């Protein structure tokens, strides 16, 4: 070490004349590197060649060791770019600095920096000792095993010559060091107890050197995950990773791989758990990768590094004056950015241990005293200094399987089938040899985090929303404030990447663009699923979609319907030549480009549906004016080709009905009276909700309910001129009004009964799984539970006290053990919150109308003439009596349904603002004759027939006012929102 120092000092004097002639004669007063003991105690180390043991170690009776990984050193004092030494001199000098007298680092100085190292595969699939026995998946005839869907690096680049398949292993192992840089594994989680799988932990050694990217080569790139340098693995090491870039090995090597490596998960979509998880999913997970929210460094550097939630977010949790039902008190702005002075204040407040800690802890204890145990435990965990938003709790493959089993069959937020998504779209280039690998990795990272956020929020809690698990563990996302912070973080990170995406738009593949835009679709789905009003997310999503020119794809031709299997094979073969490139492959066929265009059109359709839902639910103006009737029919066609949404025809019908509901919502939001003053008489163009088969789908029943409610409102508003007149209600008018009310109540009852049968909590429940469909394959060693042994959620109440209530509705809902299960059993929907809230609002408006109308009809019976009138009156009274019976059942069903996650919604009739808005609407839209009441009330006019005619007119007048009040309230809901 001294010899190399004496050689480098004269060269430094020659190379850096600014340092002066005395630089060569100056001796260093301290060692170049402190020993481990001095570094730990942060004391001065006087270790040298002449003194093998420093003073501190000599006093403690220890020896100087240098086993810690050396940190990167900065430039020398007086360094300038003009005085930068040549590359060879800098390398030798850097090697001399890292030199020490320890035997551990004897070979470091002579080791070149460009040593060939190997690109590590996905480390979470490394088998562990003592794991579950290997399970061979049962695949469909001719199907290919699925590869790992995130960050699967390719083995080639567009400027490199593609080697043969037989020499693939040697080609990868013989690459130079610059091509063998890779990222740390992004998923360090163990197996989820939601599914019987064993995911292994990354057990290899940590990298000994961290190399940063060249600042001159990435000026326009983002500060994304740090590149890690790994050691060369032994030969055959890659055979343990079935989802790495080596999955393209020959068939013989793949068979050997299956014999030596343990398969960590089934490839099927429907796999019943080996043991009922009950309340134990997410019980014990290995530490996942943490969120980097509020970090001053790279937004995605080393995803496995922990980070704490900032105290500015915790303040809303610990405040006693915070309203738990309003999100504005928790997060007034959707995207807060902590500033450096705030961070310094937080550090200083965390360091103070004096008089502040005692009162603060006492206040927190008192504030949680009157709260339920589960809620206080959630807030205590969320507000603790060690709380953090940890992603990676669900393994990647299980995350995709949960989505396609519980979420996709009801509403395809990712509008593509499972095989195409996992085997094609998610296989993008993340190797550092690509100029856009950082962008690809960043987009995949937050796409995965957004999907996990959706799944974790949708998972059913054992004792209802916001309850603690049996082992005391609580998911931090059950906290309202933490959920809002997690949602805002995912949205902010994906928006921040948009300038870089526009800058590299010509270099990005269509796959990456689809994944990026699908992330916005997932975030808008989460907002609709929990019923949270955040118009900023939807507005920015529309802006991003317009920036990407997605509306231009609407004029392109659609993919041919006769999508044959042979043409797909030709398409895949043609795309295989440029399969790994991060740039758009110009050699693709026109049909392959049309396939991606179909995906972009579907994403645009889904965004229009979310826009329409938010417009109707919260009463905001519609942002996209594109009609959906013809666009949905063209874009979402049933097929079994590569670019289809769903290959099962029954599941596709459920998806289609959800899109039809989007058409009705779009029509209602565009046809508001506040926008168009004239009365709307036309019905939506697509009348598919009148189909008998559509009554078995909740979205179709909700669309039918909305149309019936709108038509009834229009009919009732036509009676507004008669409100203050002397005309009495006729029997025909009463019969028409009664028919509309009874039909609306019947639709409400059928819709709630169907929700109760399918999924009363609108949650992902392992005990209430969708039925096994055609094309789903399970493992031969796994015993599938019978349908009778896997009851729907309606028979498995979350609380024991509600068990009797659920048993009452077994016969009502037809939940017999041998009955065929519903095709949408166990699936979740983004419309359930809006359905339940709007039915509760309408119930408050119409629940007294049947009784009032029956009273009027009974009073009119003595005055009726003819036997026909008597029969019609009896039938009318009978239908109104049945409606009253259904109202009682509707009230019970609403009390049993628990779709609310973390936000509660107050009835519109109980809001003070609703009464004011209804009064203003009546003043604006009511006829002039109604605004000016008549001088002589109709109730005081003498009756021509008998003494009881005055009482009859009074009852009719009361019914008239009740009907018109309900009509104005219904109009207020349509104009200003349901929630």
Curated annotation (Swiss-Prot):
InterPro entries per the UniProt record, alphabetical: Carb_Metab_Trans_Reg, Zn2-C6_fun-type_DNA-bd_sf, Zn2Cys6_DnaBD
Region annotation (Disordered) ranges: 1-47, 65-142, 165-219, 249-380, 563-590, 926-954
Bilayer-crossing regions: none
Biased amino acid composition, Acidic residues: 565-574
Polar residues bias (residue ranges): 170-179, 186-207, 310-329
GO molecular function: DNA binding; DNA-binding transcription factor activity, RNA polymerase II-specific; zinc ion binding
One Pfam family hit: Zn_clus
Cellular compartment(s): Nucleus; Cytoplasm
Protein name: Glucose transport transcription regulator RGT1
DNA-binding region: 35-64
Family named by the database record: Belongs to the EDS1/RGT1 family.
Organism of this sequence: Lachancea thermotolerans (strain ATCC 56472 / CBS 6340 / NRRL Y-8284)
Source taxon at top rank: Eukaryota
Functional description taken from the UniProt entry: Glucose-responsive transcription factor that regulates expression of several glucose transporter (HXT) genes in response to glucose. In the absence of glucose, it functions as a transcriptional repressor, whereas high concentrations of glucose cause it to function as a transcriptional activator. In cells growing on low levels of glucose, has a neutral role, neither repressing nor activating transcription.
Coiled coil residues, start to end: none
Matches recorded under SMART domains: GAL4
Predominant localisation class: nucleus
Comp. bias regions, Basic residues: 358-368
Biased composition (Low complexity): 132-142, 251-263, 296-309, 369-380, 942-953
GO cellular component: cytoplasm; nucleus
PANTHER family, sorted: GLUCOSE TRANSPORT TRANSCRIPTION REGULATOR RGT1-RELATED, GLUCOSE TRANSPORT TRANSCRIPTION REGULATOR RGT1-RELATED-RELATED
Alphabetized Gene3D superfamilies for the sequence: Zn(2)-C6 fungal-type DNA-binding domain (4.10.240.10)
UniProt feature, compositional bias: Basic and acidic residues: 1-14, 36-47, 105-114, 280-295
Key words of the record: Activator, Cytoplasm, DNA-binding, Metal-binding, Nucleus, Repressor, Transcription, Transcription regulation, Zinc
